[in-house]
Regions:
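Phosphate-backbone binding interfaces of nucleic-acid-interacting proteins
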Residues: 1-135, 269, 286-288, 292, ...
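Conserved mixed alpha/beta core segments that line enzyme active sites in large multi-domain catalysts
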Residues: 1-16, 174, 191-258
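Glycine/proline-enriched, intrinsically flexible loops and inter-domain linkers
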Residues: 2-4, 127-222
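Conserved phosphate/anionic-ligand binding catalytic regions in large, soluble enzymes, centered on
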Residues: 20-27, 103-123, 180-205, 245-267, ...
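Conserved catalytic alpha/beta cores of large enzymes that bind or transform nucleotide phosphates
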Residues: 60-61, 165, 232-340
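Terminal amphipathic helices with adjacent charged low-complexity linkers/tails
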Residues: 120-147, 321-350, 357, 400
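Flexible, glycine/charged-enriched surface loops at secondary-structure junctions
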Residues: 123-134, 183-188, 317-331, 375-378, ...
Length: 480
């Protein structure tokens, strides 16, 4: 135990503390007697014969982390006695969103995509993310070979070195913890942060263990130890990231133990890639290994995000660690592109399918806020679908109608009685008798009703002008 003198800003407090990492002049989180933590109220107590007037807290005791190892050390310059809420993002706002709104929207698997939706709903401007320009004066460039272009859309990577810091800022650790992730180290935390922020998975390899990158499937089945220290059976249809011929990661799923970022890592090769979603899903299922990265790749991510993610990583790293440098040119193998999608419609189409009058100005404003490019051509709207919605999401005019109406608000639709006359259908005595007979046979005589393939007369179809040559035919047409 330690008997501490703690400067609480208003006076000096006597505190008994057993934390192993306490030291003189350490700036910590302190709760005075009478204050509260998630576990309850802090009271004065006598410990080993000494009065303790408060509590020096770990991040776990404050509900900000699962780290119980020692006191939470404040990493910003703030006066003693400052409320932690004034310097860290402790107060959190939780929005409850129906999962069906997210499942098939890969752009909403990151906070920036959600922010775009809120900006459109509230008529606010979406702020751009600060990015690095990846400026580099040399000619060093990481060699990348894509051996399976059918399984890769884009592979971007860049090297960064002169990294001296190992721990991410507390503000970042708190945000990660609130999103269900624990802080590991600066580089790992940055990759997780960008994945949560942008929805784009990234992976940092120890640069000292990477010479050249080969993205390919193995020539024969092999063993591979992943970051969780588990040996995996890799088949010949599993896409791997290799250092030459040595596997260093399972593409889109998990990195390898041998290229893991460790405490003294001072240079990294950052991977920002886009892999085929079906391939990732099959490999993930076969290995019994589903990760945050694989869950996103399965949704068919936007290949345009890879370079942006690399620039974002470099910006955040250099903002935290001022000495960190871009140490190579950007390698960008853009193997396959999704086709650009343009959709043309007019206001009459919107009016017909919504039943309400949404102004042309509102249509343009809504689509623009959601990232669509809109050009007016007479009575028509020519809309270019943004890349982050063009991966099997928005493809037809009806999809555009959905975008307009959901932002307009379904609750704002007027309730209008239909003008179509509704007439009750007369019951059929034959159908009623048939159903009654079926009930008797099933309920009283324990028979089973079987619905088999229906016999049909091709000649009747031909008389009706129905083409039957290309129809699917049952080989064994015996009915029971």
């Amino acid at each position: 135990l330690h008997l501490l003198k703690v400067d609480g800003g208003d006076r000096i407090y006597d505190v008994v503390c057993g934390a192993p990492n306490v030291r003189e002049n350490m700036k910590i989180a302190f709760v005075k007697a009478g204050g509260r933590v998630p576990a309850g109220e802090i009271t004065k107590a006598t410990v080993a014969g000494y009065e303790s007037e408060g509590m020096c807290c770990s991040a776990f005791e404050l509900g900000l982390s699962d780290d119980k190892a020692g006191l939470m050390e404040i990493d910003v310059d703030a006066p003693n006695g400052t409320n932690l809420k004034d310097i860290y993002p402790i107060d959190d706002i939780i929005f409850e969103v129906d999962n069906k709104s997210l499942t098939n929207r890969p752009d909403l698997w990151g906070h920036y995509g959600i922010a775009r939706e809120f900006a459109a709903l509230t008529d606010r401007e979406l702020k751009p993310l600060p990015l690095s320009d990846l400026a580099y004066d040399g000619d060093n460039k990481i060699k990348v070979t894509v051996g399976r272009p059918d399984l890769v859309y884009r592979y971007s990577c860049v090297k960064m070195d002169n990294i001296s810091k190992n721990t991410s800022p507390l503000s970042m650790q708190i945000r990660l913890y609130y999103c269900g992730m624990r802080g590991i180290n600066l580089l790992a935390d940055l990759t997780n942060y960008i994945m949560l922020e942008m929805g784009q998975p990234t992976h940092a390899f120890d640069a000292n263990k990477i010479d050249e990158i080969v993205v390919d499937t193995p020539k024969e089945d092999c063993k591979f130890i992943t970051l969780d220290n588990t040996e995996r059976d890799i088949t010949t249809d599993t896409l791997l990231i290799q250092n030459g011929s040595t596997p260093v990661a399972i593409a889109g799923i998990m990195g390898g133990l041998d290229s893991e970022i460790v405490g003294d890592t001072n240079a990294v090769v950052l991977e920002c890639a886009n892999f085929d979603g079906v391939s990732v899903r099959k490999s993930s299922s076969r290995l019994g290994l589903r990760t945050d990265a694989s869950a996103r790749y399965e949704k068919m991510l936007d290949p345009e995000m890879t370079v942006t993610a690399a620039k974002r990583f470099a910006y955040l790293l250099q903002d935290i660690d001022k000495g960190a440098r871009v140490a190579s040119l950007l390698t960008d193998e853009y193997v396959r592109k999704y086709p650009e999608i343009e959709i043309t419609f007019d206001k009459a189409y919107v009016d017909k399918y919504t039943g309400i009058d949404i102004s042309e100005e509102r249509i343009v404003k809504t689509l623009t806020a959601l990232g669509f490019e809109v050009a007016k051509d007479g009575a028509s709207f020519n809309v270019k679908v943004p890349s982050f919605r063009a991966t099997k999401d928005v493809t037809i005019k009806a999809d555009i109608i959905e975008e307009i109406t959901r932002i307009y608000g379904y609750d704002n639709f007027s309730i209008i009685t239909t003008k179509s006359p509704l007439k009750p259908v007369k019951s059929s005595p034959v159908r009623s008798q048939s159903n009654e007979i079926k009930d008797i046979l099933v309920k009283h005589y324990n028979l089973h009703e079987v619905h088999s393939y229906i016999w049909c007369d091709v000649r009747k179809y031909k008389k009706l002008g129905i083409e039957v040559e290309d129809n699917v035919k049952v080989l064994n047409i015996e009915s029971s």
